[in-house]
Each structure stands twice: as C-alpha cells, then as structure tokens.
Amino acid sequence: MAIFKDYLENKSPLILHGALGTEMESLGYDISGKLWSAKYLLEKPEVIQKIHETYVAAGSDLITTSSYQATLPGLIDAGLTKEEAEQIIALTVQLAKNARDKVWATLDDSEKANRPYPLISGDVGPYAAYLANGSEYTGDYGQITIKELKEFHRPRIQILLDQGVDLLALETIPNRLEAQALIELLAEEFPEAEAYISFTVQEPGTISDGTSLDEIAQLVGQSDQILALGINCSSPLLYNQALAILKNAGKALITYPNSGEVYDGSTQSWKPKDKDALTLVEHSKDWHTQFGVKILGGCCRTRPNDIKALYAEFRT
C-alpha cells in the first residue's frame, strides 16, 4: 500500500468525511447506547451508505468507514456471533466503497478533474469507544495493558485491511499507551499498512490522558507507517498550540475539530458554541496557512454543508 502517501504529495489539501452520528440524529435516528450509530449497521445499513454518498458529493477525498464503534467485543455484547460481528465490520467497507463509486459515476469529467478519486479510510476508533464512558476525553483506561489493547484492535484492523481499505484512520486516541499499542501492532503484524493517527486534547500542550504533545510527536515521528498526525474531536480553540508542537514529528498534519459545541461526557449532551466563534472554514484556512495542515475536515456536530464549504474554499 502506498496510495495514501502519493495523495499526500498532491498540492491541494485533502478533505475528510464529516460526522456520521450527527447525520443519523438529524434524520431522526436514536444513536444512544454503546454502539451509537453502529447499531444501524444491523438495522438500516442503507441509511449509512446514503450518508456516505452525501459526503462524497460534498467533496470528501477520504471516506471514513462506519467502524468507529464497530468492534468485535461491542458487537458480540450486542448479541451477535463472532462470525456475524466480522461480517458487520466488513460491511462498513463495502458501504463506503458503494457510496464512493455510486457518486463518482455521476460526476462529469470537469468535476473529476478537480479532485482525486476518493480513498477509503478504515476507521479504528479508540478502546474508549467500546467502553462508552466518555474516556475519549480523559484517556482513563484503568489497568489495561499494551497486550490487551493490541488484542482489542487486531481483529478489526485485519478485517478492514482484508476488505481493501486504502489506509487506516486511528482516530480519537486519548491515551499514550493506546497510541504505542497501535503503532507497534502495525509494525509487527501489518507492515504494509498506511495510516494516520489523531488524538483528543482537553488542555493546552497535552493529549487527554495528560501525556505531553512533545512526547506524542516523538512517539509518532518514529513510525514509518503513520503518515499523518493531528487532532480531532476537540475544541478548535486548542488546535493552534497543539499543531505548533505536533509539526515537530515531521508528518503531514490533520485537523478535524468538533463544531465548537462542547460535549459533556457526564450528561452525554452538547453545550452551545460561542455565537462569535469562527467557522470551520475560517479555522481550517488559518491552520492551513500557519502550519501547512494537509488534511482538513470536521468531527462531531459537523455536517455535509461544512465539508462542502471546505471543498469550495480549497478546490474552487
């Protein structure tokens, strides 16, 4: 696999997929519970494909599979057999591919010439997503070991790669040990895989578990397989300081913040953003100009129109 590396050498920044769960909610679907939007892989997979299609049409260059919450333990806990759970994870790749190919076939030659053929990124959410206790924002995994984290992540990564994703999206990582486990797992068992890794931050200068961003930059900088590094699922107000540090890893930079609203893990609800807050496009322009950010998108509470606005800014 070397296609992601080739795409990063393009002059224009790459545009990410936006939020999936937010779109499910906007369509009236209840995503509460441990599986979040992944439960609709069981009940309404066609709705997930339709949301992917909306993002492809909006201009996304990286189409992220709906496997963030789809883990073997989580799906088995929901009553599936191991084989059924594996099939559901594989389905996330097929839905993303179907959406990409369906929309791409509708574009005219000038539209295709203005953007690269979208890649499929296999979403590898954190252990925190399985715990479903808000630890994406604390990094508190208790006494878990690096071996246990590798065992947790291995089967999903294997399935995603077997299904032909172009890269892995190791995202919303709140914990240094988990980052180390993922980097080692790729090197030891999936040496041909390409990936990006993205962390959550709650305070300036550290990821969510308190590890310094300097230490994270050093850790990620040692991996030949991690081609991009950044921040997601965090307040955009924390990004400038984080990017100034993470650029020292020598990787392409990636940003996909939340909308500016603040998530309260204790109540599982969102607090409104400041009415004077910058838009996603305004923040992204700043990060691209200041730090050369190569991959731009949005996370929680962002919508297809946000991705469309990024496309309009950076591609037209």
Language-model segments: residues:
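Domain-level signal for soluble alpha/beta catalytic cores
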Residues: 1-316
